């Protein structure tokens, strides 16, 4: 049976696939890294993410929205991290390690009310991001810090993200 051209025009259009959370976390981490290196570079960040990570403008802008929210809460996040880290200081960690901690802590705190992400998923994602962007030796400290924080109720953030959050 042959399909006529007019039949193809009536075929249902597939909705685009949702942006995977793993990819979103990678983009947010890369954006946080870029802004820590060049704090004035936010204007060119969307185009940089589009080019380097091969993502749409919409997804790059979405990642930048999370990056801005994390940076808005950075003093509170860093204070909690500084109070938890015992063997070193937050400043002595690599840029990637600091930003992985900030991002995962933010996601944990941000999503408590709407759709909490299980701690096991956050720990697994932390491990994956460390393996991909850092070195495995640093993972034990990062995981210990997050584990210690996740064992206690999450404090409220001053500048929460819009209701869309990372819930999708």
From Swiss-Prot:
GO terms for molecular function: RNA binding. One of its GO terms (biological process) is DNA-templated transcription termination. One of its GO terms (cellular component) is cytosol. It holds the Pfam family NusB. The keyword Transferase does not apply. Gene3D superfamilies: NusB-like. Keywords: RNA-binding, Transcription, Transcription antitermination, Transcription regulation. SUPFAM superfamilies: NusB-like. Belongs to the NusB family. Involved in transcription antitermination. Required for transcription of ribosomal RNA (rRNA) genes. Binds specifically to the boxA antiterminator sequence of the ribosomal RNA (rrn) operons. NCBIfam families: nusB, PRK00202.2-5. This is Transcription antitermination protein NusB.
């Amino acid at each position: 049976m042959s399909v006529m051209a007019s039949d193809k025009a009536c075929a249902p259009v597939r909705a685009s696939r949702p942006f995977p959370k793993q990819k979103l976390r990678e983009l947010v981490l890369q954006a946080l890294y870029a802004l820590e290196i060049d704090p004035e570079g936010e204007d060119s960040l969307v185009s940089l993410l589009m080019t380097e990570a091969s993502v749409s403008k919409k997804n790059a802008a979405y990642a930048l929205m999370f990056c801005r929210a994390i940076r808005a809460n950075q003093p509170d996040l860093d204070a909690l991290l500084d109070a938890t880290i015992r063997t070193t200081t937050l400043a002595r960690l690599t840029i990637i390690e600091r930003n992985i901690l900030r991002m995962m802590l933010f996601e944990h705190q941000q999503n408590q009310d709407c759709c909490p992400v299980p701690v096991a998923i956050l720990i697994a994602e932390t491990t994956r991001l460390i393996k991909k962007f850092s070195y495995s030796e640093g993972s034990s400290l990062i995981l210990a810090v997050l584990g210690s924080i996740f064992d206690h109720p999450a404090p409220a953030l001053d500048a929460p993200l819009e209701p869309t959050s990372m819930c999708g």
